[in-house]
Amino acid sequence: MKKLIGGVSHHEREIEELREDREYAIATLQLAMDSLENPEERGGGLLALRAVAEAYGGLGAVAAQAGISRESLYRALSPKGNPTLKTLVAVLKTLGLRLSVTEKREANAA
């Protein structure tokens, strides 16, 4: 990633904020998981999951703890990735989180 002279890249700052604020990281993951059901938003959701993984140990360490090759995790959490349920569960478990099911709320429901 290109370094900014006298500054910090947006990506580096995002990783720092995710690392410093666990509630923010969890909220980011909740939005990311919601976006996975929409094909137009899926890539952004996967990148958000990737950013949280980077913030909590880096992709290499998360992959090792999750029992996944680093290359597979990079592919799965890329904008065109298609992670398996096994991969999602393993990554979330490594981050100290788990999947949860809630009732879908329609945007136009009263």
Where are each of the predicted segments found?
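N-terminal flexible/basic segments that precede or flank functional cores
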Residues: 1-48
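Major-groove DNA-recognition helix of helix-turn-helix-type DNA-binding domains
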Residues: 80
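Short alpha-helical DNA-recognition segment
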Residues: 51, 55-74
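DNA major-groove recognition helix of helix-turn-helix/homeodomain DNA-binding modules
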Residues: 85-102
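Short, residue-level hotspots on alpha-helical faces of the histone-fold
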Residues: 31, 51, 90-94
